[in-house]
């Protein structure tokens, strides 16, 4: 058995914008805040993607999706995750579990926790996903996610 651990982290600033939405784990969330990001700014999928890349020793998402590349403007983060999953598939690695923590102050995670979990299970095929939430004391105009992934293979 070959066991791999990957860790990922992402954060984005928020600015006030009435009747806006952010994406968390591929789920659109209505809010009065807007993410400042080049892609769709999904901190959950970005942290997960980096953790997946870590399991394969493939670097980080910035190596594959340059933030200065205009073709990545508004990019759906599911595209990023799917690219990372294809890299991992070459190593025949399979998920054991995904454990992540979302840090946010004004965006309430609890009402959408199970929707995020379900989305991640569907996107990754992993049936052991844990989503935790913590409030940010400061800065309040930021959202972040930390993610740890455990994978294994019998090669």
Curated annotation (Swiss-Prot):
A divalent metal cation binds at residues 10, 12, 46. It comes from Mycoplasmoides gallisepticum (strain R(low / passage 15 / clone 2)) (Mycoplasma gallisepticum). This is 2-C-methyl-D-erythritol 2,4-cyclodiphosphate synthase. 4-CDP-2-C-methyl-D-erythritol 2-phosphate binds at residues 10-12, 60-62, 65-69, 140. Pfam families: YgbB. The record marks 38, 135 as: Transition state stabilizer. Homotrimer. Keywords: Isoprene biosynthesis, Lyase, Metal-binding. It catalyses: 4-CDP-2-C-methyl-D-erythritol 2-phosphate = 2-C-methyl-D-erythritol 2,4-cyclic diphosphate + CMP. Pathway: Isoprenoid biosynthesis; isopentenyl diphosphate biosynthesis via DXP pathway; isopentenyl diphosphate from 1-deoxy-D-xylulose 5-phosphate: step 4/6. It comes from the Bacteria. Its cofactor is a divalent metal cation.
């Amino acid at each position: 058995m070959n066991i791999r651990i990957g860790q990922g982290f992402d954060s984005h600033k928020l600015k006030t914008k009435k009747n806006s939405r952010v994406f968390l784990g591929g789920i659109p969330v209505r809010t009065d805040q807007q993410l400042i990001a080049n892609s769709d700014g999904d901190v959950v999928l970005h942290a997960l993607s980096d953790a997946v890349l870590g399991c394969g020793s493939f670097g980080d998402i910035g190596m594959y999706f340059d933030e200065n590349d205009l073709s990545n403007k508004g990019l759906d983060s599911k595209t990023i995750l799917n690219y990372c999953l294809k890299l991992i598939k070459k190593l025949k690695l399979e998920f054991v579990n995904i454990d992540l923590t979302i840090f946010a102050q004004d965006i309430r995670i609890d009402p959408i926790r199970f929707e995020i979990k379900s989305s991640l299970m569907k996107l990754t095929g992993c049936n052991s996903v844990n989503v935790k939430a913590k409030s940010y004391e400061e800065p309040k105009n930021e959202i972040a996610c930390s993610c740890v992934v455990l994978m294994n293979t019998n090669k």
